């Protein structure tokens, strides 16, 4: 049947909103630290979500997106953009480069765009 043939040719892409998943994991999980004292709860939670998504959706491709550090054009256009949002916790900010390194090791492209 033609429909079955088309369905086998369709490729599946999964896009992970890196900052959103890390932020959610950071606040959802208790502080987890390595033997060196580095907090890794956001990394752990991110990887749980990431591997669950890979297992559930079986994508052909996966990419991750991350926000650029402020200020961006949104801050320039809208002075109130995220104005009331508290500063990101240092313990969370320190985990961002680490998860990017992990994703790079897994050959997952990372996109950051203003």
Predicted feature residues:
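Intrinsic-disorder-associated, low-complexity terminal segments enriched in Asp/Asn/His/Tyr and depleted
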Residues: 4-5
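Noncatalytic, basic helical substrate-engagement surface that gates or grips nucleic-acid strands
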Residues: 8-114
